């Protein structure tokens, strides 16, 4: 294949329920065989890398397209989500006869949350009747209308077996790619998640992946995280052609010196020495829980976090920022439910490579595959420590003596009362605020000043924070 400098590399995902025809569609479109075909399942099991993402490629006008075939089986949803993190657009394949299934909806939700431009491909029109095709098209239109970002997605009807409709699909895919403003960060440090690793006789260790950011040249000294191996690039291939340099967005294979394939696993990332990537076992993310998620999440609950190509078990600690006594405090949330937005600390069961701004998906993989297992989504904002607190509410009452206002019931002694001086209190029935100015006597009575007139006997509330957990 002649490679023109004007050609643009893009990555297109193939999604859909098992047996709806994704792989057959890939064969219709493909010009270059799958990268993973070089890897044998027995070898992959020995290395701990499951061969469950298929990669192949073809050209379309000015685009060199890498197809990423995501698994459709319910047990491999984590891998399908991983595929969503390395693509620019997607084809969602639906069986015309069977219609959308559970994994169809799950995959569409992933694409919607990651905001991946998508074409719905209704396949197997050669074996479905007109009524079945119309019904499937109607169902898909209804589902698309319920999405956030994919309401205007095109629906194309094809037969991957006979080739009917493939020309129209290619035309629509080109139109979609033409409409995208794909930005590649080629001036950053290198970030390339490794999805396959194997040995080739006479070449040595070869890794494949899609470059997220930066560039790589033959001869570069790089680092593999989280194992912290130093390696050197011997050669680079892009679309089966030897190249001396590759950029963000390119799907590449690289021969490396300094590492054996047995040392690598999904979650390893190839990066440059100037990297800002972190290897962590916890991070903070800004999170949104899906309206459709029917279960509540509570502190210290076990979830699964997808980040890049990796899905790892984690403990969730949700919190909000609340102003208490003029100071913003991280306050624990005892539960979060569908539609809620908050901050979360995620404590991971293994160390992972994370970039600030990385998108995450939160899942409950312990739930049955017939129900929605994706809880929500978020963005990594920090790796620092946050001491989450809880609010302690105390109640007292107003006592008026002559021209003085006192509060009783918030403290049991003068010493305890002195610790409350400066604290803000309020009358909940009237939303009147006041400040504790001092103590009175030895039994914990407090002197207070309020913004407005208050009456004796009214309930007074004091909020304070304590360390949680």
Swiss-Prot record:
GO terms for biological process: selenocysteine incorporation. Residues 69-72 are annotated as: G3. Residues 7-181 form the tr-type G domain. Pfam families: aSelB_III, GTP_EFTU, GTP_EFTU_D2. GTP binds at residues 16-23, 69-73, 123-126. Residues 159-161 are annotated as: G5. Residues 48-52 are annotated as: G2. It comes from the Archaea. GO terms for cellular component: cytoplasm. Its main location: cytoplasm. Belongs to the TRAFAC class translation factor GTPase superfamily. Classic translation factor GTPase family. SelB subfamily. This is Selenocysteine-specific elongation factor. It comes from Methanocaldococcus jannaschii (strain ATCC 43067 / DSM 2661 / JAL-1 / JCM 10045 / NBRC 100440) (Methanococcus jannaschii). The gene is selB.
């Amino acid at each position: 294949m002649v490679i023109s400098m004007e050609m643009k590399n893009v990555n297109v995902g193939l999604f859909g329920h098992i047996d709806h025809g994704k792989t057959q569609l890939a064969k219709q479109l493909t010009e270059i065989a799958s990268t993973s075909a070089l890897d044998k399942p027995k070898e992959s099991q020995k290395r701990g890398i499951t061969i469950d993402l298929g990669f192949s490629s073809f050209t379309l006008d000015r685009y060199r397209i890498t197809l990423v075939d995501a698994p459709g089986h319910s047990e491999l949803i984590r891998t399908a989500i991983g595929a969503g993190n390395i693509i620019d657009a997607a084809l969602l394949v639906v069986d015309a006869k069977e219609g959308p299934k559970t994994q169809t909806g799950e995959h569409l939700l992933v694409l919607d949350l990651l905001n991946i431009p998508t074409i719905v491909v209704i396949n197997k029109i050669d074996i479905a009747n007109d009524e079945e095709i119309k019904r499937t098209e109607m169902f898909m239109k209804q589902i698309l209308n319920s999405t956030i970002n994919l309401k205007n997605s095109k629906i194309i009807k094809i037969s991957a077996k006979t080739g009917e409709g493939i020309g129209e699909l290619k035309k629509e895919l080109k139109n979609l790619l033409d409409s995208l403003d794909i930005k590649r960060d080629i001036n950053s440090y290198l970030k390339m998640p490794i999805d396959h690793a194997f040995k080739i006789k006479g070449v040595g260790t070869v890794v494949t992946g899609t470059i997220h950011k930066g560039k790589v040249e033959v001869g570069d000294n790089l680092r593999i995280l989280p194992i912290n191996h130093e390696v050197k690039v011997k050669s680079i291939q892009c679309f089966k052609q030897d190249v001396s340099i590759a950029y963000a967005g390119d799907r590449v294979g690289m021969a490396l010196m300094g590492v054996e394939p047995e040392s690598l696993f999904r979650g390893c990332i190839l990066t440059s020495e100037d990297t800002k990537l972190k290897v962590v076992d916890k991070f903070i993310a800004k999170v949104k829980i899906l309206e459709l998620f029917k279960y509540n999440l509570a502190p210290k609950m076990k979830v699964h976090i997808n980040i890049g190509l990796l899905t790892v078990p984690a403990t969730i600690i949700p919190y909000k920022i609340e102003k208490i006594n003029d100071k913003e405090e991280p306050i624990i949330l005892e539960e979060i439910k569908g539609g809620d937005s908050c901050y979360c600390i995620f404590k991971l069961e293994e160390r992972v490579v994370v970039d600030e701004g990385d998108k995450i998906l939160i899942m409950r993989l312990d739930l049955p595959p017939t129900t929605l297992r994706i809880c929500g989504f978020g963005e990594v904002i920090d790796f620092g420590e946050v001491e989450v607190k809880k609010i302690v509410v105390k109640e007292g009452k107003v006592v008026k003596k002559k021209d003085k206002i006192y509060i009783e019931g918030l403290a049991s002694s003068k010493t305890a009362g002195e610790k409350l001086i400066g604290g803000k209190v309020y009358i909940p029935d009237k939303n009147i605020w006041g400040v504790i100015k001092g103590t009175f006597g030895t039994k914990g009575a407090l002197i207070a000043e309020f913004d407005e007139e208050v009456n004796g006997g009214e309930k007074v509330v004091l909020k304070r924070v304590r360390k949680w957990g």
